[in-house]
């Protein structure tokens, strides 16, 4: 799905955008933003972010630098260390969960 969407955006960038001229008020352009959003967040969230961006790009809207938001980092908590409960936020890693090391520091 992402591949098809990216193909349509590239088609717009190559065939249609040069005929219309530069119109985007933001950096990166809306089409480049859409490509980055699809690459970073996938089809559903990428389309949502791109649609919101295109709706903001009008003469009475904002302008300037507006990057794609980074992908959220999930956090896990560690509990029961030295008979006290401590919560330590660390980036979630799948290999820790596979090795069953998620409940203690090491």
From Swiss-Prot:
As for subcellular location, the record says: Cell inner membrane
Cleavable signal peptide: none
SMART domains per the record? Haemolytic
Q: Spell out the GO cellular component terms annotated for this protein, sorted alphabetically and separated by semicolons.
A: plasma membrane
Q: Does the keyword Oxidoreductase apply?
A: no
- What keywords is this UniProt entry annotated with? Cell inner membrane, Cell membrane, Membrane
Provide the primary localization.
membrane
Instruction: Please give, as recorded in its UniProt entry, the membrane topology of this protein.
Output: Peripheral membrane protein
InterPro entries documented for this protein: Membr_insert_effic_factor_YidD
* Family, similarity comment: Belongs to the UPF0161 family.
Q: Which NCBIfam families match?
A: membrane protein insertion efficiency factor YidD (TIGR00278)
Q: What does this protein do?
A: Could be involved in insertion of integral membrane proteins into the membrane.
| Name of the protein | Putative membrane protein insertion efficiency factor
